[in-house]
Amino acid sequence: MALKHFLNTQDWSCSELNALLTQARAFKHNKLGNGLKGKSIALVFFNASMRTRSSFELGAFQLGGHAIVLQPGKDAWPIEFDTGTVMEAETEEHICEVARVLGHYVDLIGVRAFPKFLDWTYDRQDIVLNGFAKYSPVPVINMETITHPCQELAHIMALQEHFGTTDLRGKKYVLTWTYHPKPLNTAVANSALTIATRLGMDVTLLCPTPDYVLDERYIDWAQQNIADTGSTFQVSHDIDNAYRGADVIYAKSWGALPFFGNWAMEKPIRDQYRHFIVDEAKMALTNNAVFSHCLPLRRNVKATDAVMDGPNCIAIHEAGNRLHVQKAIMAALASQ
């Protein structure tokens, strides 16, 4: 039987994802368990984290396990991922050794590694995550690279709790780009598009121009998913039409893929679209929609105080669910 990793949700069947969500709900009501008793996880962070690190460390503890945190280039040696490289630069060891050695010590490995933002054709290969998955003898969990599947499940769990049902088919789901002064990762947007179409929601991707449409891989996944579920997917640049009648507004900012490595040219374009902020006027067009965001969020840049503090905002609940879904993921993978 092939080793099962948690790299993205598209690799897992709907029944497997539903089982994870069912287990996550159980953990939410009874936080302690023994799914990691006597086991350990290495959490490898190439980028900063608050919610991900704290929820994974605490989750491992609550399951009776132990987590160690490694930050290559800070408290651990810099790692090389390219093959055939003459390692005369700053990297001290290669992933083919790192992953295999860690696999002798721990039972799971979590990886968080953002794009370099210089060349999307390179970044989309996700070489850090895939390098760990290729060489690791133990299951690997994606803690956010170019997708964020843990956030996906926490988001869906929060939506199911809000609507009081696990069946989200037919909900109008709007994934909206929002302004941010810096170009950000597309990971959460890629994941939101994937899971929303997978679960049969009618999805609108709202963004300022075609340059902000997500990578074709995730557009293709969305098209495959709606073919399976009978739901719909469209890209829109019209704010009012996108918001009108929506049941879910999910906000995220991301950099335009054609400008990777040339952000000075992208910034004046992005600066024209500050009006994509989620505010009360836009929310008034919806079907009393629920609003969420993965956090962190710059208030009154991405969404107004009134939206964030309003009764329909579930961003805090979504973030809280990270603990429960990650415990479910760790327990499932550790039981292989």
UniProtKB/Swiss-Prot annotation:
Binding site for carbamoyl phosphate: 49-52, 77, 112, 148-151, 294-295, 322
Any one annotated GO CC term: cytoplasm
UniProt xrefs under InterPro entries: ArgF, Asp/Orn_carbamoyltranf_P-bd, Asp/Orn_carbamoylTrfase, Asp/Orn_carbamoylTrfase_sf, Asp_carbamoyltransf_Asp/Orn-bd
Locations listed in the record: Cytoplasm
Root EC class: transferase
Residues reported to bind N(2)-acetyl-L-ornithine: 144, 252, 295
Pathway(s) annotated for this protein in UniProt: Amino-acid biosynthesis; L-arginine biosynthesis
Molecular function as annotated in GO: amino acid binding; N-acetylornithine carbamoyltransferase activity; ornithine carbamoyltransferase activity
Superkingdom to which the source organism belongs: Bacteria
Annotated site residues (Key residue in conferring substrate specificity for N-acetyl-L-ornithine versus N-succinyl-L-ornithine) in this chain: 92
UniProt KW keywords: Amino-acid biosynthesis, Arginine biosynthesis, Cytoplasm, Transferase
SUPFAM superfamilies: Aspartate/ornithine carbamoyltransferase
Pfam families, per database record: OTCace, OTCace_N
Sites of N6-carboxylysine modification: 302
Broad class of where this protein is predominantly found: cytoplasm
EC number: 2.1.3.9
GO BP of this protein: arginine biosynthetic process via ornithine; citrulline biosynthetic process; L-arginine biosynthetic process
Regulation: Carboxylation at Lys-302 increases the catalytic activity of the enzyme.
Family statement drawn from the similarity comment of this UniProt entry: Belongs to the aspartate/ornithine carbamoyltransferase superfamily. AOTCase family.
NCBIfam families linked: PRK04523.1
Quaternary structure (record): Homotrimer.
Stated name of the protein: N-acetylornithine carbamoyltransferase
Biological source species: Xylella fastidiosa (strain 9a5c)
Source taxonomy: Bacteria, Pseudomonadati, Pseudomonadota, Gammaproteobacteria, Lysobacterales
